[in-house]
């Protein structure tokens, strides 16, 4: 015989198990959103992508800096082995010329000797032995032949590509955290199933004990109950192990304190399907498209090597005393550099970049085909999960009805304790299958959102 559970109790238990299936409009758990946010902040891979993006921004600044004027201050001291002077003939010529100019200035006839009382200026050195210089230089590229413009555009597209790669990585991390969180919810749901089974067994144990006292059952029945309880305890131990492992995984993914994660009691509520009808371009496709554009602009940059470049040069000396007779104090000049032939290097580099862009185009087309297939597979998996949930709910109804029937038969000595335990096991398995079905349903929706490129909007 068996103690019966009231119809109200059975209805209450059934409602508890059906709650998740009624939650199709539920949004993502706020706690799960917070864990995803912490996981994204902690991820080393995302941090590396962010640093790559910063490097791309620095590359843009470097390209822009080419067109900025460069100012350089210079200072030096040099000691020569001797003064640099004119040769003797040139010095004699300069002295004679000086005498002629003086004679003309004072009115002395050309053929008269030069007066000895008039001092002459010594011929200056071309360069003194000790040279102290201090100067400033200005170098300014006025036109780079479009190299800078194309380099900046290529770098901007590279930055955009890296941003999309980072977003794709965020989606993968979010999927991993959602799956781990759902596994933890499945473990807790399994615990609730075990608790229900434990209550059934406790009631059976109470009845069998009374039945043995009244001679209506044998001790074998009690031993079978005890064996079932031990098996249940083993499952409970497995639950604790799984819970510990999943909490550790969440800790590693999010950096959240283990004690706080232990306090979580997630529920397997179905995710919202409101966004499933939308489809957006995946971050992976956007990243490849931006990389393709970056390669094309890189090709243009390398081609522009043949366009003339225009630059301005300026120089100013602060110290004049040690300048040679040939050194200017300052100068300003403009120049053109035209690379007419470089041994086909620019052409080959440009061709290499074009081939790189063609590789990206092939990857884009392949990715689009794979994504289209993944959307179909995810959609079919989602529809299958919905159907599977309905089937499992029918199995629960059947297992529950069977258990009630066997309970009545056992009460009237028409069934053995083995039949009761088998019926209870079937009911327990059906409840487990329902929770696994809810888990699979959430997985299929998350994968469908990811395949359609709208997962980011779901967890942000």
Describe the function of each predicted region:
Residues 47, 71-85, 121-129, 139-168, ...:
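Small/polar (Gly/Ser/Thr/Ala-rich) solvent-exposed segments
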Residues 2, 33-34, 58-60, 164-281, ...:
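Periplasmic alpha-helical coiled-coil/stalk elements that build and connect Gram-negative outer-membrane
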Residues 135-137, 181, 311, 333-335, ...:
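Membrane-embedded beta-strand positions in outer-membrane beta-barrel channels/transporters
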Residues 82-125:
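A subset of solvent-exposed loop/turn segments in beta-rich extracellular surface proteins, enriched
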Residues 25-86, 216-218, 254-296, 300, ...:
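Bacterial Sec-pathway N-terminal export signals of envelope proteins
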Residues 48-63, 169, 173-192, 210, ...:
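Amphipathic alpha-helical coiled-coil segments
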Residues 24, 32-33, 72-74, 79-98, ...:
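Acidic, low-complexity, intrinsically disordered peripheral segments
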């Amino acid at each position: 015989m068996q103690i019966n559970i009231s119809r109200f109790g059975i209805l209450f238990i059934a409602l508890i198990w059906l709650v998740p299936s009624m939650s199709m409009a539920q949004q993502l758990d706020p706690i799960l959103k917070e864990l995803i946010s912490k996981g994204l902040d902690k991820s080393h891979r995302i941090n590396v992508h962010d640093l790559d993006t910063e490097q791309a921004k620095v590359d843009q600044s470097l390209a822009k800096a080419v067109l900025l004027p460069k100012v350089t201050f210079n200072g030096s001291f040099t000691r020569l082995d001797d003064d640099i002077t004119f040769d003797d003939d040139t010095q004699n010529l300069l002295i004679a010329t000086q005498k002629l100019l003086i004679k003309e200035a004072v009115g002395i006839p050309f053929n008269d000797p030069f007066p000895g009382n008039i001092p002459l200026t010594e011929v200056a050195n071309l360069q003194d032995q000790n040279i102290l210089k201090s100067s400033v230089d200005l170098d300014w590229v006025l036109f780079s032949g479009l190299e800078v413009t194309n380099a900046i555009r290529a770098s901007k597209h590279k930055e955009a590509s890296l941003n999309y790669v980072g977003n794709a990585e965020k989606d993968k991390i979010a999927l991993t955290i959602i799956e781990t969180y759902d596994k933890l919810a499945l473990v807790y749901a399994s615990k609730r199933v075990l608790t229900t089974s434990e209550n059934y067994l406790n009631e059976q144990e109470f009845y069998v004990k009374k039945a043995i006292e009244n001679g209506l059952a044998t001790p074998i029945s009690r031993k079978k109950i005890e064996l079932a309880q031990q098996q249940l305890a083993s499952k409970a131990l497995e639950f604790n192990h799984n819970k510990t492992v999943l909490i550790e995984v969440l800790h590693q993914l999010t950096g959240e304190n283990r004690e706080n994660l232990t306090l979580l009691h997630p529920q397997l509520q179905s995710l919202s399907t409101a966004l499933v009808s939308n489809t957006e371009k995946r971050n992976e496709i956007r990243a490849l498209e931006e990389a393709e554009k970056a390669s094309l602009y890189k090709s243009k940059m390398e081609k522009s090597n043949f366009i003339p470049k225009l630059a301005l040069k300026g120089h100013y000396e602060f110290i004049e005393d040690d300048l040679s007779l040939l050194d200017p104090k300052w100068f300003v000049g403009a120049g053109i550099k035209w690379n007419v032939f470089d041994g086909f290097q620019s052409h080959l580099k440009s061709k290499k970049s074009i081939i790189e862009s063609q590789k990206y185009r092939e990857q884009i087309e392949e990715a689009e085909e794979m994504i289209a297939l993944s959307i179909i597979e995810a959609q079919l998996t989602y529809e299958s999960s919905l159907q599977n949930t309905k089937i499992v709910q029918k199995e629960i109804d059947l297992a529950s009805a069977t258990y009630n029937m066997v309970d009545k038969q056992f009460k009237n000595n028409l069934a053995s304790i083995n039949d009761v335990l088998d019926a209870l096991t079937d009911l327990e398995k059906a409840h487990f299958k329902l929770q696994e079905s809810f888990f699979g349903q959430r997985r299929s929706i998350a994968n469908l959102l990811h395949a359609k490129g709208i997962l980011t909007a779901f967890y942000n």
